[in-house]
């Protein structure tokens, strides 16, 4: 309570104390945790802070509910760095996919039963992220790598992951900034059969010694037997010598690859007709009229 007073009094914040818990627990021996570890779990789970007073630093507050905080405490004790989407109290409901999105999902699932690659040639705002994640959910892929030339889109993938997997505790997301670390994801996959989506940037992987880079890193990522690799903005960076080297190391014999792009003109020659789903501006306008 003394700590709470320190962070509320100067900002004039009224509070209700709803729950207390000892910070000592047993996991192979006595351990303890602090509030910053719980805050880290909340932040990596996509839960936003509420800043009341930037001058007096009253910024250790989060917009969430008691049950989510209890789960965050439990996650710290279990050695996890985030909550699954199903553990965070949010008012999500199933996505109502448009007919063209349903067609892309259906065609991809059908293609992946007989082949290993698919290209979505779909214009901006098609909903490629949500639709691709629905493919992952429907096909129950255990290990999925999301690869992009634009690391900034991590937040968007993480948010959409929550919208698709809000009802599945057996799916987890991980990246440098959100969700779990790769090591934690793989550990949970091995021990509990967890399904996961790991987000990685092409720039980071290109610097790895495994593909001729200067740094001894990402060895585990390259060694993983990925079930699916989703390449976001696939026309960017994947056709260079280094980009091809990265894909060559990542893709194993049974790995499925789904490439997403609004302008895949440098990729089309590498795909057969039944390996491409197209939704362009003209098709969109026709759909609006009909």
Predicted regions, residues:
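Interdomain hinge/linker at the junction between the two RecA-like core domains of SF2 helicases
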Residues: 273-290
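Conserved Walker A/P-loop ATP-binding site and its immediately adjacent core
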Residues: 129-165
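Short basic/glycine-enriched coil/helix segment immediately N-terminal to the Walker B
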Residues: 112, 116, 191-194, 211-227, ...
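Walker A/P-loop
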Residues: 113-135
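SF2 helicase catalytic motif II
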Residues: 202-204, 218-259, 263-265
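Conserved pre-motif I regulatory segment
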Residues: 86-121
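Non-catalytic accessory segments flanking enzymatic or RNA/DNA-binding domains
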Residues: 2-99
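Inter-Walker segment of RecA-like/P-loop motor cores
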Residues: 166-213
């Amino acid at each position: 309570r003394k700590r709470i007073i320190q962070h509320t009094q100067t900002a004039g914040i009224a509070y209700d104390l709803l729950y207390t818990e000892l910070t000592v627990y047993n996991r192979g021996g006595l351990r303890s945790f602090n509030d910053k570890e719980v805050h880290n779990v909340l932040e990596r789970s996509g839960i936003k802070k509420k800043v009341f007073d930037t001058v007096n630093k009253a910024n250790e507050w989060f917009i969430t509910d008691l049950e989510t905080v209890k789960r965050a405490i439990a996650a710290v004790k279990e050695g996890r760095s985030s909550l699954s989407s199903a553990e965070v109290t949010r008012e999500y409901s199933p996505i109502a996919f448009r007919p063209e999105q349903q067609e892309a999902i259906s065609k991809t699932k059908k293609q992946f039963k007989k082949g290993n690659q698919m290209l979505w040639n779909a214009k901006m705002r098609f909903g490629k992220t949500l639709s691709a994640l629905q493919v992952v959910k429907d096909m129950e892929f255990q290990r999925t790598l999301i690869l992009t030339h634009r690391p900034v889109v991590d937040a968007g993938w993480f948010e959409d992951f929550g919208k698709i997997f809000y009802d599945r505790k057996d799916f987890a997301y991980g990246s440098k900034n959100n969700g779990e670390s790769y090591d934690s994801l793989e550990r949970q996959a091995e021990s509990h059969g967890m399904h996961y989506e790991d987000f990685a940037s092409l720039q980071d992987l290109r610097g790895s010694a495994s593909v001729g880079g200067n740094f001894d890193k990402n060895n585990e990522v390259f060694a993983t037997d990925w079930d699916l690799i989703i390449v976001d903005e696939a026309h960017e960076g994947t056709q260079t010598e280094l980009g091809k080297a990265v894909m060559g190391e990542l893709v194993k014999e049974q790995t499925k690859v789904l490439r997403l792009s609004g302008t895949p003109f440098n990729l089309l020659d590498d795909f057969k007709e039944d390996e491409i789903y197209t939704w362009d501006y003209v098709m969109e306008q026709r759909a609006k009229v009909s």
